[in-house]
Amino acid sequence: MGVTGILQLPRDRFKRTSFFLWVIILFQRTFSIPLGVIHNSTLQVSDVDKLVCRDKLSSTNQLRSVGLNLEGNGVATDVPSATKRWGFRSGVPPKVVNYEAGEWAENCYNLEIKKPDGSECLPAAPDGIRGFPRCRYVHKVSGTGPCAGDFAFHKEGAFFLYDRLASTVIYRGTTFAEGVVAFLILPQAKKDFFSSHPLREPVNATEDPSSGYYSTTIRYQATGFGTNETEYLFEVDNLTYVQLESRFTPQFLLQLNETIYTSGKRSNTTGKLIWKVNPEIDTTIGEWAFWETKKNLTRKIRSEELSFTVVSNGAKNISGQSPARTSSDPGTNTTTEDHKIMASENSSAMVQVHSQGREAAVSHLTTLATISTSPQSLTTKPGPDNSTHNTPVYKLDISEATQVEQHHRRTDNDSTASDTPSATTAAGPPKAENTNTSKSTDFLDPATTTSPQNHSETAGNNNTHHQDTGEESASSGKLGLITNTIAGVAGLITGGRRTRREAIVNAQPKCNPNLHYWTTQDEGAAIGLAWIPYFGPAAEGIYIEGLMHNQDGLICGLRQLANETTQALQLFLRATTELRTFSILNRKAIDFLLQRWGGTCHILGPDCCIEPHDWTKNITDKIDQIIHDFVDKTLPDQGDNDNWWTGWRQWIPAGIGVTGVIIAVIALFCICKFVF
């Protein structure tokens, strides 16, 4: 018995010791005690990458693709400039990739171009490809062009973004935005993070306009599309046009449309009425893009000179029209004009407004400008039928027009947008907001958007101007979400504590620091978002909870990264194409050399001199720049004020785990003492 008891005692103690160790191991696994908790700010990005790969990115289900618009990088968005970035080519099949969320776009495009023989230039959209769902302005271009190729590609290697599908080509009559595709890492797989239902949800006329789905279609006519001699006309109606220039903003075009409409200067003849804007006129009128933080646009619209020419279509001879008779006193605003033969008073307006997803024509537009005409020199132009047309030139004086003020004051740490003028809509007459003078009223076009703070001031307002505010993201509900980063995290990436204004100044010019998604399911699902590469997520507690705020430098850096990566890939594409061409030529040379027909160059001619260019150094420089900007840089030191988020809060999981282990040890000792 004694021997047996002596032998059993170590075995019992061994069992108790083993039980104790297993309890500690189980608690450690349950609470995930971070054995390598980040305790300073000298962490290298490569270390963050190791933590991410080891502990966070455990499944591809954590990756979510997001479309980023090129306009966020500050590219020109006017139609003449944008179309120069597109070109036709043959022999390259289109590619389509999907993405799960996109930004709200300020400018989208829709093309319907025909060849001179009447055939279509662009292919029809395949089944499943729908137009980009969130556009403030849709530039719809119709016309003709040579279209020297089967498909229209992006010359800079970007995608054409459709509804959650990105394609390398443009599809006929389908709205798109220019952009690239980036990726998010979620802290854990969330199947419901992005909504999967179609965005063309049914709506009714009484739906809350704060849903934000409000779009304005602006129509253009193009001749010689895709050539260096392309001419664009802004369409007021089917007979009235304005010669388009790159300096025209969408807001200016809408105000110009309103002025032409209300002044009775639209054509009611069978000929075209084409207006030309004085090159000295300042066209920077109206709202800025919704992501701009500086909205201090204050000036008075003084005057505009518009000249028009009449182009007969042969249905009616209008060469005998008399020129307009105008008042000769430049100091008065009274007119005795007789040009109404060329203008209809009741013809429909051009602007088509997509309100709540449905197209509705603007039934009436009101301008506050005072129109006066003064006699100008008359010229004659031979028409297509060799007839002579009198071409009167009118001067539109808008000196009585309103003084548009858009003060947008921001503090260093604010996240809300301040006052912008309230806009009128097609559902009701304009409401005066500016009271600087007795005659000055709101001169914004009825299609111009208004900020969320002011949309309730206008009766029947069907639009919402989306600003970078937390309140707005809540009002957008299911359709939109502005996602930002924690202030401390933005400092880690962009270099110390900086104000919002300073961060934007040091970032890429006109870079959009805010991402306004249109497929995010809810705010709660956005907890712990992080960008790749090397922007997270949660290196043992850095991104623990909450939406990410003040990520100006972070998002701009991501845009630059995507842009540089795209350029590098474009060089790869060019090198691959040239190598392929060179290989084909070599094959032809070998074939012909065997026939002894005088040699390769004698047979192939100038094509014999083609050789692939070496783009290795260019590509290497781009990759090295990306590594230098985003990989090799260390996370800078943060003060106590900046590092509070990465300070005590990162110890919460560790504290819970340690506390649990201590409780388990105490309980174990109590049980052992009670049992034994």
Curated annotation (Swiss-Prot):
Instruction: Identify the stretch annotated as signal peptide in this record.
Output: 1-32
What's the impact of mutating L635V? 60% loss of release of soluble GP1,2delta
Q: What does the record say mutating P636A does?
A: 60% loss of release of soluble GP1,2delta
Outcome of swapping C670F? Slightly reduced levels of expression of GP1 and GP2. Greatly reduced GP processing and association with retrovirus particle. 43% loss of virus capability to enter into host cell. Loss of localization to the rafts
| GO CC annotations on file | extracellular region; host cell cytoplasm; host cell endoplasmic reticulum; host cell plasma membrane; membrane raft; viral envelope; virion membrane
Q: What keywords sit in the KW lines?
A: Clathrin-mediated endocytosis of virus by host, Cleavage on pair of basic residues, Coiled coil, Disulfide bond, Fusion of virus membrane with host endosomal membrane, Fusion of virus membrane with host membrane, Glycoprotein, Host cell membrane, Host membrane, Host-virus interaction, Inhibition of host innate immune response by virus, Inhibition of host tetherin by virus, Lipoprotein, Membrane, Palmitate, Secreted, Signal, Transmembrane, Transmembrane helix, Viral attachment to host cell, Viral attachment to host entry receptor, Viral envelope protein, Viral immunoevasion, Viral penetration into host cytoplasm, Virion, Virus endocytosis by host, Virus entry into host cell
Region entry Fusion peptide, spans: 524-539
Indicate the impact reported for Q638V.
No effect on release of soluble GP1,2delta
Q: Impact of mutating D632V?
A: No effect on release of soluble GP1,2delta
Impact of altering F88 to A/E? Complete loss of virus capability to enter into host cell
Q: Where is this region: Receptor-binding?
A: 54-201
User: Which Gene Ontology BP annotations are present?
Assistant: clathrin-dependent endocytosis of virus by host cell; entry receptor-mediated virion attachment to host cell; fusion of virus membrane with host endosome membrane; symbiont entry into host cell; symbiont-mediated killing of host cell; symbiont-mediated suppression of host innate immune response; symbiont-mediated-mediated suppression of host tetherin activity; viral budding from plasma membrane
What result follows from mutating I170A? 90% loss of virus capability to enter into host cell
Q: Where is the lipid attached (S-palmitoyl cysteine)?
A: C670, C672
Position of sequence motif Important role for host BST2/tetherin antagonism: 660-664
**Ranges of Low complexity composition bias in the record:** 414-432
Q: Which residues are glycosylated?
A: 40, 204, 228, 238, 257, 268, 296, 317, 333, 346, 386, 413, 436, 454, 462, 563, 618
Q: What is this protein called?
A: Envelope glycoprotein
Q: Which organism is it from?
A: Zaire ebolavirus (strain Mayinga-76)
